[in-house]
Structures are given as structure tokens and as C-alpha cells.
Regions:
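Condensing-enzyme catalytic core mediating Claisen C-C bond formation in acyl metabolism
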Residues: 9-13, 30, 36-42, 338-414, ...
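Acyl-CoA/ACP chain-elongation machinery
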Residues: 43, 309-333, 337-350, 384-396, ...
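Active-site pocket-shaping loop/turn-to-helix segments
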Residues: 73-91, 153-155, 199-202, 210, ...
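Active-site-proximal alpha-helical scaffold in enzymes
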Residues: 89-103, 267-271, 278, 284-318, ...
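Phosphate/pyrophosphate-binding loops at sites that engage ATP/ADP/AMP, CoA/4′-phosphopantetheine
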Residues: 96-114, 277-278, 369-374, 404-421, ...
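Active-site-proximal gating segment of KS-fold condensing enzymes and close homologs
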Residues: 123-282, 327, 332, 431-444
Length: 533
């Protein structure tokens, strides 16, 4: 082996998991000991043939931890304002702290030398969907109200005009079709009414008078003492708005129907909440790299630690539970299985399964942390190589992944023949064949290969964390945990290599080096190289 370019050794000193059928790492490891699938039918469209990985999670389990450290209302605030994507990350982070007692205090005491790099692949689709629907319903009611005759003189005149004049008015204004002239059996009447009201509400004289009154209410600023005055002003404005709306009898304004929880759940909030709950004051950033996200966050930590900017980092990814939007989007991209059966890598290439959950690690300068009595988990982290295909948004290239692998090996000082096991991204699509060819072009064919999306599905960004944790859990103890795969299922074109694929029985291993690659939507690749301590 070549000497590493940097001397700082990096270890894992805490990890937490939220995954299908796995609320924590202990259950995750136990489940991995059996070659089964953790997928279940998806009910988001009503009956369908989709299988998904639904995370097993109860945020209430973490209430005692939060109550012990914060004011009594903190848990209820988090529970009501945070979506599950944030909650999964919080739960996994709290799990991390249990692995090495005392590390929580160190994260706080290190100040700017403790970093947080936790991102997401999709954002909180389920929460966004519900809140957008709420706004949309409010906007429809609002438009309909201000298009009534008593609030819209122009539309009132239009309605009593002759058919010829109505056509002329619509043509002159460029108005959408009048729903009064639509056959509901031929066209969607609801959408026609919605487009009609959305056009005419802009010309409502009643609404313009209302907005003039509203400007008077909203135009008042803070006077006198700012700290005392701001609260009084907010309450006074709320009261004045209620009186104004009662006077007009109007529904809730659409801007008042937009829930601020949309803002409290933007992509950097999982990292931000970890920072606040852990009182970690160093840089807190949300890396976004789709399916390669976990190893990209690990790469950021490695770089920060080896450059001397950080001693310890919280890293990871979190994804929402499967939702109609995520399942439908993956299906529309033609990468999702929809036949009611588990689709396994290297078999029928029928597509993958959407999953959600979180994986959070605490990584750091191993000598520094072990010197303080903390014990490393799993494997030593040697390197992460990152590259981009700069080609297709979803179909992997040859050069991009190979470049990431070569970078990681070079940075780790590892020769290809030193790699004993390799975990693949493998989404049970035709891309599995390309990925296998890329792997074998750089690495020797004697290594043992794992691919686990047939077990727990594909979390958009968290999948790499689950897969890397599974590799660490087994390989650090001298074995590769079984995979939900049988030899007779392997695709004919891949069958010449099937003996290298870890299948439904654990496999003892020789050697010390493990590798892992993930390839993300957009063409980003991340390859991690690790070694037994």
C-alpha cells in the first residue's frame, strides 16, 4: 500500500439510522442478518403495484432526551413545526450521541472546530404537498369571492351583456374561456372556473378597495422601544386585519393561508436543528448531491478535518417517507418497479423502490478522539473521491464513476488489488450492467460485491449512508452481511460474475479494504474507501 497523502486518520464515533423496519442501528443490524426485503405495498395512489420502504419511526421516543435539555415546550414546537424529514435526522443524531458518552459535550465545547454537514435529496415532499394544497384551496376561495357581482362591477356588466358583446370583451382582454359556455361532460369544469376567476380577480374593483384599506393597516411601523413595540404592533395588526375581513365577509387571504412551516423545513433545516439541539456552533451546511449525498457529506468532513478546520463533524442525509410525488416522479423517469414484486439489483432490471429515512454519523480526527477515551466504530475512513459525468442527467457514464474510484484509491494510497469488498449503487435498472463494467475495469474481479436496494429500497440521498453503515457493520467483524439475492435470480448477462455477488448467506472475508460508490441524479459520483482498524 502507498502512504496516504495526509496523516490524519479519521474514524466514525457515532451513528444513527432511521430506515424501513429499522428505527435504530441495533435493529438495522439485526435485520441485515436475515436476507429479507423490508419493502411494503404503497397506498399513496390508492391500490397500486408499487412497493416502498416506509421508515419505522416514532419521534415521541426522543422526547425524554429533548425534555432533559430544553424548556418543556421545545418538543411540542419541534413536533408541530418540523416535517418528518427533519425529525428523522434529529432522531438519528440523538442515536449517534449514545455510542460514545461525552461526545455531546465535546461537540459543544469545540466551538468552530465542530461542523455539521447534513443534507437531503428531495426535501420534504409530503409536507410541501399538504401545505401547497392548503394554499391552493384558499386561493381558489379568495378568487371566487372577489369575482362576485357585488365586488366586481366589470364582471357584473359582462354577465348581463349579450353573447356577442361577451365574446368581444373576452377577445379584447385575452380572457380564458367562460365556464358558462363549457360542456362539463367534455372539459374539466373545475379547472375552467379556476382559470376564469384567476384572470378576473386581477380586475376586481372591490378587491382593490380592500387592498387600499389593508395598506393602511400594514403600513404602520414600530414606534418607541423596539423590543416592546414589535410584539404590540404584530398583535394590533392581527386584530385590525380580522376586523377588516369581518367587515367584507371575505375568506382567509391566500397569503395568510401559506404555512410558515414551509420555511422551517427548507433543505438546510435538518442540519440547523442538529446544530441547535447539539449546541454545535461551527459551520452548519446542507450538502445536496442526490444519491451521492452521504459520501459527499463525508468528503466535506474529511477535507475539513485534514485541513485543520475541524476536529469532529456530524454528517449525513435524510429523506422523506415515500409519497405520491416521489413515487410518481421516479416512475415517470422509468426507474421504478411497478409489478408488486421486489426488484433486486442484477436480476430483471425492472427498476428500484422509493424509500425514506435518515443516516447520521459523527466522524472525527481519530487520534484526537481516541486520546480523549472515545472508541471508533466500524472501519477507518481513508478517502472519498467525487466526480461528475457532465453527460446525462440520470444514465451513468463510464468515465465519471471510474474517475471517482481512481481518485479515492489514489487519495487512500490503496492499490486496486487491495480491495476485498465493494458495495455498488445498483438500482435494479439497466445501469447495473454499466456500473458493474465500470467497477471491474478499475478493480480486480476477485473482490466480493454487495448491493442492498432489494432489501431496503432507494432513499434518494440516504441510501449511501445505509449501505455504507451495513458494510461497516459486517466487514469490521470479518464478514459481509447477507443480501436479499439468490444465484438463480441473477440476470443471464451478469451470471458469469454471480459467484462474486454476496447472496442470501453471510460471507466471511479476507483483506482489510472496503469500497463503496453511489451515483446521483445529475451525474454526480462519490466513492468511499475504508479499512479495518
Amino acid at each position: 500500500m502507498k502512504a496516504m497523502a495526509e496523516n490524519t486518520r479519521i474514524g466514525v464515533f457515532g451513528w444513527g439510522i432511521v430506515a424501513p423496519r429499522s428505527p435504530d442501528v441495533a435493529v438495522f443490524e439485526k435485520n441485515l442478518g436475515r436476507a429479507t426485503s423490508w419493502l411494503e405495498p404503497f397506498a399513496g395512489f390508492g391500490p397500486s403495484n408499487f412497493l416502498v420502504g416506509r421508515p419505522e419511526f416514532d419521534f415521541g421516543f426522543y422526547k425524554p432526551w429533548i425534555d432533559e435539555r430544553f424548556e418543556p415546550r421545545r418538543f411540542s414546537q419541534l413536533n408541530s413545526k418540523m416535517g418528518n424529514t427533519v425529525k428523522y435526522a434529529i432522531g438519528a443524531f440523538i442515536q449517534c450521541l449514545e455510542k460514545n458518552p461525552g461526545i455531546e459535550s465535546l461537540l459543544r465545547d469545540l466551538g468552530a472546530q465542530a461542523h455539521v454537514y447534513v443534507g437531503t435529496g428531495l426535501g420534504d415532499f409530503p409536507l410541501q404537498y399538504e401545505l401547497v394544497l392548503r394554499y391552493h384551496r384558499a386561493q381558489k376561495k379568495w378568487n371566487q369571492f372577489w369575482c362576485r357581482d357585488e365586488h366586481h362591477s366589470e364582471l357584473r356588466s359582462y354577465r348581463v351583456a349579450t353573447a356577442r358583446d361577451r365574446k368581444r370583451i373576452c377577445d379584447d382582454l385575452g380572457a380564458p374561456p367562460d365556464p358558462a359556455g363549457i360542456d362539463p361532460d367534455v372539459e374539466d369544469l373545475d379547472e375552467t372556473v379556476e382559470r376564469w376567476n384567476a384572470f378576473w380577480v386581477l380586475r376586481s374593483d372591490g378587491l382593490h378597495r380592500y387592498l387600499e384599506r389593508s395598506r393602511e393597516v400594514e403600513g404602520e411601523g414600530v414606534t418607541g422601544d423596539i423590543d416592546n413595540g414589535k410584539g404590540l404592533l404584530i398583535r394590533r395588526k392581527i386584530s385590525s386585519r380580522k376586523k377588516l375581513n369581518a367587515e367584507y365577509g371575505c375568506p382567509t387571504e391566500p397569503w395568510n393561508a401559506v404555512d410558515p412551516n414551509l420555511l422551517w423545513n427548507i433543505p438546510n433545516i435538518p442540519a440547523a436543528q442538529i446544530s441547535m439541539l447539539g449546541r454545535i456552533t461551527g459551520p452548519t451546511i446542507a450538502p445536496i448531491a442526490a444519491c451521492a449525498g452521504f459520501s459527499v457529506s463525508l468528503k466535506m468532513a474529511i477535507d475539513a478535518i485534514r485541513s485543520g478546520q475541524a476536529r469532529i463533524c456530524v454528517i449525513g442525509m435524510t429523506d422523506p417517507e415515500p409519497h405520491a410525488l416521489s413515487v410518481g416522479a421516479f416512475f415517470g423517469a422509468r426507474v421504478l418497479s411497478h409489478d408488486g414484486r421486489v426488484s433486486k439489483p442484477f436480476t430483471g432490471m425492472r427498476g428500484t423502490h422509493v424509500s425514506g429515512g435518515a443516516c447520521i454519523w459523527i466522524v472525527g480526527d481519530a487520534e484526537y478522539l481516541m486520546g480523549k477515551g472515545f472508541e471508533p466504530l466500524g472501519l477507518e475512513i481513508l478517502s472519498v473521491g467525487v466526480s461528475s459525468d457532465a453527460d446525462h442527467i440520470i444514465t451513468p457514464s463510464e468515465e465519471g464513476p471510474r474517475l471517482a474510484i481512481r481518485q479515492a484509491l489514489a487519495e487512500a494510497g490503496i492499490e486496486p488489488e487491495d480491495v476485498a469488498t465493494w458495495d455498488m449503487h445498483a438500482t435494479a435498472t439497466p445501469g447495473d450492467w454499466t456500473e458493474l463494467q465500470n467497477t471491474l475495469a478499475v478493480l480486480p474481479g476477485s473482490m466480493a460485491i454487495t448491493a442492498r436496494k432489494g432489501t431496503f429500497g432507494h432513499g434518494m440521498s440516504v441510501c449511501g449512508g445505509w449501505e455504507l453503515t451495513a458494510q461497516h457493520l459486517g466487514f469490521s467483524k470479518g464478514a459481509l452481511l447477507p443480501v436479499n439475492l439468490e444465484g438463480n435470480e441473477v440476470h443471464q448477462q451478469i451470471r458469469p460474475y454471480y459467484r462474486r455477488l454476496v447472496q442470501d448467506e453471510a460471507r466471511p472475508t479476507e483483506g482489510d479494504v472496503a469500497g463503496k460508490i453511489n451515483m446521483g441524479v445529475g451525474g454526480i459520483n462519490a466513492c468511499a474507501i475504508c479499512r479495518r482498524w
